[in-house]
Every structure is written in structure tokens, then in C-alpha cells.
Amino acid sequence: MSIQVFCDFDGTITNNDNIMSIMEKFAPPEAEEVKNRILSQELSIQEGVSQLFQFIPTNLHDEIIQFLIETAEIRNGFHEFIQFVNKNNISFYVISGGMDFFVYPLLQGLIPKEQIYCNETDFSNEYITVNWPHPCDHHCQNHCGLCKSSLIRKLSNTNDFHIVIGDSITDLQAAKQADKVFARDFLITKCEENHISYTPFESFHDIQNELKHLLEVKL
């Protein structure tokens, strides 16, 4: 049995949710209603996020990138955590509902690109279009956009020990099939509503300490 870690990006690896930061900075007020409908599950993630990015003109590309480079912060302990999982031969994947145009630059030099799964964006028209290269498989009907539970099934074996790290509604379906969940913020609320066991965290030092104990037990 091997340990596999599946980690969210926005609000998990980074301190802030970058999509929400983009919307607050660049989108019109109407985006707030769409965001609330996503969180209340009135809109699927795929439908809601597609609508959000249709508010953003493509000519803001460079300005958005610069804004995120200046404002996005990597969560405390992440660099050391990556060294830890590599040293212990633990498989690590970023499974992010975020967008390629900011996920790849912010993780450059930290995570190999082949271990990152995120959505793709098209800047060829007036407004940003989101493409969805990792859709739900036949086990999931939630219109996730990037389907984290489907990616877990694709990337792992049933006898692997699955760890999910996340912070929001977008991580709920993955949390449902994890052997261990590390949660913060809104994902804690959703785990409690769905009776999913979880360990709260604020830094990756917290997660690393828990994983050390887990490795000792597994050994």
C-alpha cells in the first residue's frame, strides 16, 4: 500500500482563494451573486466558475498575472512539506479547480508540471473562457468542472491510502472518498454536514506532523 496525497491549490497551498481574489479585484458586482450560488450549491462548480470568468475581459491577462504574483502567498510550511513527501516517497498531486494561467506560474520550481491538474483558459475572445480537461467520470454526476474524485480514481489504486487536503466546497467530493482528510475553512463545515471525519489544519507543518505519525503506524 502506498500513500497518495491529493492537494487543493486555492486557499490551501495559497493563503487566499485566487479565483475569489480575481473576482473581487476585476469582476463587476454581479459576480457576487454567482459566487454565493456556487457556495450554496444552487449552481454546479463548472457552471458557476464558467459564468464568473465570463465577467473578466481577456485584455486584463497581464494585469491579473501581475496582481496574483504580488498578492498570492504560499501557505506556511508548504516548501518543507514537499521536501518531506519527496523524502518519504509519498505521491503528491495538486488537483485544483484553479486556472492554468496562474496555477503553473505560482507553483513553478516547487511542483513538476506533470503532478499538477487544473483547468485551462482561452483568452482568444473578448472574455475569458474556461475549458474543462478533467471532467466527471461515470461515478460522479456533480458537474464538478475539474472532478477531483474522478482524478483520484484515475491516478491511484483502490488499495492506496488516499489523503485529501482542501478548504472549500470544491474539495467535498474528493473528501468523501479519502481515507484521511485535512480540512480548513468552508470544507470543515461541509465535512461536518456530511459526517466526514477530518483533521483541521492552518499550516502544512500541522499536516506534516500528522503524516509523520501516520508513517510510523503504517511501518
Curated annotation (Swiss-Prot):
SUPFAM superfamilies: HAD-like. Signal peptide: none annotated. The keyword Amino-acid biosynthesis applies. Keywords: Amino-acid biosynthesis, Hydrolase, Methionine biosynthesis. It is an enzyme of class 3 (hydrolase). NCBIfam families: DKMTPPase-SF, HAD-SF-IB, PRK09552.1, salvage_mtnX. Belongs to the HAD-like hydrolase superfamily. MtnX family. This is 2-hydroxy-3-keto-5-methylthiopentenyl-1-phosphate phosphatase. It comes from Bacillus cereus (strain ATCC 10987 / NRS 248). The lineage of its organism: Bacteria, Bacillati, Bacillota, Bacilli, Bacillales.
